[in-house]
C-alpha cells in the first residue's frame, strides 16, 4: 500500500511540475505602473511640470515624448533635468532613453482652465515594447506646484538654449520682458535689413520742396515709424500663424519688381519729372485733414512707413524669432503683438533721430533745396537695387550699384560746376565716377582676366555643403553621418541674412576649422517647393536663416537652433559649445 501511495504521489508531482513548466508566462507591468505619470502647473501658469516614475528595467524613449495644446498645431518644447542615456534598443537601434525617473517642463501659456494638453510618450523593457501612450490633461484639473525644482530646471537649461529660445522663455516667465525687445530693436536699427528704410524716411522729411519745422518733421517721422511698426507687427503675427510660406510669398519676384517700380517712380518724382498726388476730386475732400497727399503729407508718411515694413519683413533675427516662437507656442496674440510692435519701434527710433538732426543741420531755403531733394532721389534709387539683388543672379548686384554710383557722381560733378564750386570737387567727382564704372566696363567689354573671372565665380564662403532636396534624402544622409554632429543650413536667394552668413561667417578661418568635424548640409528654400514645405513643417521653421544641428541619433540637438545672423566669433563659440 505504501508503494502504491508513493507511486501516485510521484505521478501527480511530475504532472504538477510539467504544468508549471509549460504554463509559466512572463508578466509585464501595465503601462501606468511601468511609467507612472503625473503633472502639475507652475504658480505663474507658464510651465507644465511633468514627472515620470519609471520601474526598474523599463525605459522611455527621449524622442517619443511630445506634447501640444489640443486644437493648436505647434508642439510644446520639453526641457528635462536628467540627461538621457545611450541605449542599444532591439527595435530602434542606438537611441537615447530615460530610466528611473524624469522631471520635465513644457513651456507655454496655460491660463485657460478649459484648455487641454495632449502628452504622448512610449517606452519599452527587455522583450516587450509598449505602444505610444497619450494622456489628455485639462488645465483646470491640474494642481499648482510650489516646488523650487521647476525653477532650478529652467535655470540649468537656459544656458543651453539659443538666443531666440532664451528670449521666448523670458516672455513665458514675465510679460515685462516685452520692454526689453525695444532695446533689442535699437540694436537692429543698424543692420542691413533696416538701413534701407532710412533713405525713404529722409526723402519724406528732408526731401520736400518746403522744409518742415521740427514739430512737423517729428510728426512725419513718427507716423512713418508707426506705419512701419504696424506692418512689421501684422506680418510677424501672420508668419507665426502661417509660417514660412507667407514670408516666401512676400519675396516673390512680382512683389519685389512691383516695389522696385514704386520706388523708382518716387525717385523720379523727386527729380521733378512728375508730381505724385491724388485725383483732384478725392484730394479736395481730404484738404481739411491734409494739405496735399504728396510724399510729405502725414497720410503719405504713414503709407510709406507701411511699405518700408515690407522691405524689412523678410529679415529674421534672434529677437524676431524669439517673439514668433512665443506666439507660435503660446497662442498669446496680444503679448506677441506688443512684443513685435516694441521691437519695430526700437528699430525706428534711430531712424527718427537721424532724420530730425539732418532736418535741423541742412539749409532750410534757397536753390540748394532742389539739390538736396534730387540727392535723396538718388538715395531712394538704392532701394530698388537692394530689393532686386534678392531675386537677380549675384553677379548683377555689383553692376547695379556701379551704375547707380557712376550716374550719381557724374550728376554731382555737373551740379558742382553749375553752382560754381571749385575744380577740385569736380575732379574728385569725375574720378570717383571713373572708379565706380569699372564693373560695368568689365561686363560690357569682357576684359576681366581668367583669374578675375574665377575669383568672381568662386563661392564666397568656400565651404562645400551637401545639397539636400527632401526629408528622405536628409534621413539617409544623417544615418550615414561619420561625424558626431550634422549641420543643416536652410538658405534662400532672397534672404539677406543668409548671404551675410555665407560671406562673413562661413568664410572665417576659425569657423571653417570647426566645420572639419561637422557634416555640412544645405537646403535651398528659394522656390518653396513641396519638398521645402515638408521640411519646414517637420522642423517647425518660422523664418530664414535657420540652422539646425543633429546628433548621431539623427535627432535635433535641443536648444541648438540658430535663427538670424550670427557673426564669426559668436558662431564659432556656438559650434564649440555643441561639441
From Swiss-Prot:
It catalyses: [protein]-dithiol + NAD(+) = [protein]-disulfide + NADH + H(+); [protein]-dithiol + NADP(+) = [protein]-disulfide + NADPH + H(+). Residues 449-579 form the Thioredoxin domain. The keyword Signal applies. GO terms for molecular function: electron transfer activity; protein-disulfide reductase [NAD(P)H] activity. The chain crosses the membrane at residues 178-198, 230-250, 254-274, 296-316, 337-357, 376-396, 397-417, 420-440. Required to facilitate the formation of correct disulfide bonds in some periplasmic proteins and for the assembly of the periplasmic c-type cytochromes. Acts by transferring electrons from cytoplasmic thioredoxin to the periplasm. This transfer involves a cascade of disulfide bond formation and reduction steps. Belongs to the thioredoxin family. DsbD subfamily. This is Thiol:disulfide interchange protein DsbD. It comes from Haemophilus influenzae (strain 86-028NP).
Amino acid at each position: 500500500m505504501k508503494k502504491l501511495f508513493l507511486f501516485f504521489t510521484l505521478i501527480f508531482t511530475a504532472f504538477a511540475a510539467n504544468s508549471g513548466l509549460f504554463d509559466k508566462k512572463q508578466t509585464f507591468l501595465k503601462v501606468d505602473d511601468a511609467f507612472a505619470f503625473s503633472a502639475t502647473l507652475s504658480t505663474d501658469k507658464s510651465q507644465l511640470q511633468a514627472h515620470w516614475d519609471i520601474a526598474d528595467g523599463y525605459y522611455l524613449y527621449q524622442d517619443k515624448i511630445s506634447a501640444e495644446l489640443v486644437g493648436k498645431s505647434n508642439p510644446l518644447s520639453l526641457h528635462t533635468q536628467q540627461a538621457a542615456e545611450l541605449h542599444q534598443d532591439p527595435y530602434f537601434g542606438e537611441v537615447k532613453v530615460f530610466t528611473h525617473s524624469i522631471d520635465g517642463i513644457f513651456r507655454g501659456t496655460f491660463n485657460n482652465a478649459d484648455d487641454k494638453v495632449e502628452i504622448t510618450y512610449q517606452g519599452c523593457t527587455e522583450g516587450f515594447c509598449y505602444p505610444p501612450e497619450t494622456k489628455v490633461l485639462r488645465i483646470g484639473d491640474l494642481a499648482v506646484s510650489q516646488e523650487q525644482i521647476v525653477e532650478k530646471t529652467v535655470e540649468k537649461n537656459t544656458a543651453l538654449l539659443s538666443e531666440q529660445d532664451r528670449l521666448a522663455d523670458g516672455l513665458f516667465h514675465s510679460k515685462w520682458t516685452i520692454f526689453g525687445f525695444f532695446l533689442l530693436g535699437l540694436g537692429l536699427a543698424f543692420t542691413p535689413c533696416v538701413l534701407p528704410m532710412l533713405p525713404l524716411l529722409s526723402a519724406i522729411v528732408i526731401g520736400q520742396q518746403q522744409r518742415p519745422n521740427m514739430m512737423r518733421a517729428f510728426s512725419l517721422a513718427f507716423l512713418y515709424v508707426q506705419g512701419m511698426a504696424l506692418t512689421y507687427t501684422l506680418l510677424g503675427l501672420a508668419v507665426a500663424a502661417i509660417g514660412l510660406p507667407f514670408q516666401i510669398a512676400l519675396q516673390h519676384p512680382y512683389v519685389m519688381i512691383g516695389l522696385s517700380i514704386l520706388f523708382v517712380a518716387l525717385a523720379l518724382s523727386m527729380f521733378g519729372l512728375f508730381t505724385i498726388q491724388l485725383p483732384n476730386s478725392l484730394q479736395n475732400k481730404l484738404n481739411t485733414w491734409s494739405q496735399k497727399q504728396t510724399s510729405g503729407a502725414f497720410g503719405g508718411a504713414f503709407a510709406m512707413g507701411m511699405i518700408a515694413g515690407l522691405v524689412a519683413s523678410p529679415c529674421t533675427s534672434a529677437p524676431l524669432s524669439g517673439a514668433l516662437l512665443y506666439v507660435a507656442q503660446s497662442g498669446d496674440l496680444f503679448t506677441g503683438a506688443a512684443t513685435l510692435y516694441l521691437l519695430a519701434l526700437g528699430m525706428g527710433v534711430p531712424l527718427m533721430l537721424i532724420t530730425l538732426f539732418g532736418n535741423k543741420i541742412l539749409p532750410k531755403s534757397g536753390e540748394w533745396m532742389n539739390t538736396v531733394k534730387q540727392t535723396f532721389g538718388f538715395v531712394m534709387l538704392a532701394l530698388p537695387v537692394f530689393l532686386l539683388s534678392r531675386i537677380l543672379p549675384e553677379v548683377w548686384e555689383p553692376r547695379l550699384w556701379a551704375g547707380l554710383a557712376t550716374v550719381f557722381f557724374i550728376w554731382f560733378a555737373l551740379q558742382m560746376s553749375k553752382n560754381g564750386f571749385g575744380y577740385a570737387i569736380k575732379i574728385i567727382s569725375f574720378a570717383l565716377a571713373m572708379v565706380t564704372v569699372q564693373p560695368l566696363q568689365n561686363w560690357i567689354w569682357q576684359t576681366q582676366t581668367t583669374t578675375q573671372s574665377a575669383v568672381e565665380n568662386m563661392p564666397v564662403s568656400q565651404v562645400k555643403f551637401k545639397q539636400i532636396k527632401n526629408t528622405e534624402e536628409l534621413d539617409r544622409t544623417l544615418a550615414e553621418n561619420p561625424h558626431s554632429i550634422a549641420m543643416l543650413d536652410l538658405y534662400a536667394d532672397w534672404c539677406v541674412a543668409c548671404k551675410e552668413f555665407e560671406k562673413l561667417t562661413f568664410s572665417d578661418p576659425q569657423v571653417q576649422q570647426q566645420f572639419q568635424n561637422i557634416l555640412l548640409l544645405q537646403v535651398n528654400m528659394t522656390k518653396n517647393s513641396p519638398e521645402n514645405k515638408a521640411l519646414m513643417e517637420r522642423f517647425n521653421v518660422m523664418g530664414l536663416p535657420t540652422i539646425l544641428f543633429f546628433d548621431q541619433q539623427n535627432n535635433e540637438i535641443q536648444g541648438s537652433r540658430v535663427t538670424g545672423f550670427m557673426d564669426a566669433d559668436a558662431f564659432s563659440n556656438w559650434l564649440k559649445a555643441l561639441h
